[in-house]
Amino acid sequence: MKKHILALAFLLFLANFPFFGSPQIQKRLPFSKGVNLPVWMESSRLNTALYGKKDFENIKSLGVEVVRLPVWFEIWNEGAPDYKVSPECFEMIEKAASWCGELGMFLIIDFHNDCNGSSKTNPKIEQILLKVWPQVAERCKNMGSFVIYEVMNEPHFTSGNLKGDIAKWAKIQGNALKAIRAVDPERLVIVGGGDWNSLDSMLALPDYKDENLIYNFHDYTPFLFTHQGAPWTYLKRITKIPFPYSKEKMPPLPKNATADERREWTNYQKDSSEQNLCSPLDKAVEFANKRGAALMCNEFGVSLKYADPKERVNWYRLKCGWMDERKIIRVSWDYTQEFGLFKSTSQTRFPEDLNAPLLQAMGYKVPAGKSQSWLLAAKTSGGYSIYKNGDTGLLRAYGYGASGSLAFSQNGEEKCARFFDIAPYSAFYFDFGEACDLSALKEGGARIEFEIKSADKALDLSLYFKDSEDKTFPWRAASSLKGKFKANGEWQKISIPFSNFSDIGGWSQTDGWKNGAGKFDWTVIDSLVFQNGAAACKEGYSVRAIRIAQ
């Protein structure tokens, strides 16, 4: 009997450490790698035109197997006591699910949240989860098994008692899981730890006695490299960090270094070693295997802003390799943003602007060909539509600093973009996706036409074109809308010749505001922007049928 027990123990050891190499996850799922699609349904309802079916087709063509969709449900509901989820939110989720199902990709519906450095998890989060998740499960329970739920992204209470906060979250998560199971008993559900989804807090989770769980953690180690210069962290003063560690390449500590800066800088050689980066992965594999569960890392990445491009690619090559060796499902953060798969955040044409070395390092395909530009398509069709009935075509649309919807409809009218509770200088962008030469249109007498409706006499709105940030500085040519329509709550048509737009200056995060200097360039236009003035605006405005007319 003793021999049989020893033999069984040896077989289990080999399962965790095959050929005495890296331990491997025993429970496998039919997907292994994917990408996050943030911003679309995060933090604001004004980004719903940022992606479309073509983007999902592009993502699939890379070899992506699973898409994680962060949904900030706290802004996509009608508030206490029922926290009723917005119909528009469900429409967006169902579109994403339809596209993923058609394309053969898995979809993670992630209950996302505010994760800025100074944020903390909503103290009422349990009530919200217990109301929202049954609604989501009821709506999605008949979808295919390719749809996966994630209880919540990066919970982080700030009581000062970390161990207590982690235990508190574990209990809340268990209750949310019960609420989901009451409606959708068999669905795959992702669970994670209560300290920003850290690996250590995942290891502290109780056994929820559920066979359809995926245990999850996030991995941005070594933090000094991945988040160097990030303005939302305590590392905003530290840049030029090498990876791997090199004493000769290390920058000096900033003057009057904080305790956080000094700790990260001093420990970087050890923190960036392969031993320190891989040992936690082995612990996670052992933990998941004991639970008989799959294991996922559904956020990892490096900000492209300050990291050396080659060293950044090398980090991804190593991280992906280490996770693949252990059969850990990996879902990178993100797609088009600062941690994304493109060479920059300002130019995201597919496939021209993809970071080919990065894709190769991550085991993805590098597509050939050229994207269809909005301008070329408009010239071919003869219709320079920018926004029509909620559709932006090949353009990306997004906004900030206001409430509203990009697909608002009332009484059966065509869809419009609706904005209210508008903060000073808030803006709504139509991004052309590449620098467009509109100089011939300007010389030919082209004009911007649209319909607008507002009853707000305090509205101070302007419209401007912005030229490309790939130049030294992004300049603006603007036209004020003050006095061009009546604040009577009725739809009115506006027509503004390009010749009425004047060089007013420009702004960049690096240089701040500069007054106009006659440098605006009509040959490299990258966006059209509606912007509020210096005063807040309560009632706001609606706009529709935006186009360039010749």
How does the language model describe each region?
Residues 1-4:
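Positively charged n-region of N-terminal signal peptides that target proteins for export
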Residues 7-16:
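Bacterial N-terminal signal peptides
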Residues 25-188, 193-202, 212, 339:
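Active-site mouth of glycoside hydrolases
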Residues 36-38, 68-72, 108-112, 150-152, ...:
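A cross-family glycoside hydrolase active-site/sugar-binding cleft signature
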Residues 40-47, 223-226, 396-397, 505-506, ...:
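Short, solvent-exposed loop/turn elements at domain surfaces
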Residues 130-273, 278, 282-302, 325-326:
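Active-site region of glycoside hydrolase catalytic domains
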Residues 305-381:
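Aromatic-rich peripheral "rim/lid" segments of glycoside hydrolase catalytic domains that contact
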Residues 372-550:
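Beta-rich carbohydrate-recognition modules and glycan-binding surfaces
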